Amino acid sequence: MFENQPKGLYALALANTGERFGYYTMIAIFVLFLQSNFGWSEGLAGTVYSTFLMLIYFLPVLGGWVADKIGFSKCVTFGIVVMFLGYLLMAIPAGQGTFAITMMMVALLMISIGTSLFKGNLQVMVGKLYDAPEYADRRDSGF
C-alpha cells in the first residue's frame, strides 16, 4: 500500500487515522452521554451535538488562514496537541454539575479548534509530498 510512496505518507496517514478514531469514538456515544449524564432532552443534546459538528466543519476555514500565516506543519502539530488535550479533558470524570458542563464545553471547543488546525492542513501536507517529480505520477494513489 505504501510501496513507492513518499516516506512521510505513512506518518501522515497514521496521524489522520488517530484523529478519525478519536472523533468517531466520541461522536458515536456523544448524544447518549449528554442525555444520561446531564439528563438533557433529545432537543438540547441534539443542539449541542449539531453546534459541535458545525464548528468541526466551519472552523477549518480559519485553520487554513492560520496555516498561511505560520505554516502547515506547525498548524498540524499544534492542532494534534490541542485536540489531544481536548479529548483528555473530555475523558476526565467531572460529575454532573455546572463544572462538568463547563469542562465539557471547553473540551469541545478545544477539539473543534484542534481539528480546524489539523484536518485541512494535513491534506495539504500530503499533497506537498507529491510535488517532487519522482512522486508526481503517484499523487492520486496517495489520497
What role is predicted for each listed range?
Residues 117-133:
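Intracellular juxtamembrane helix-capping segments at the cytosolic ends
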Residues 17, 86, 99-121:
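Hydrophobic core of transmembrane alpha-helices in multi-pass small-molecule transporters
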Residues 68-83, 133-138:
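Cytoplasmic membrane-interface "Motif A"-like loop-to-helix N-cap segments
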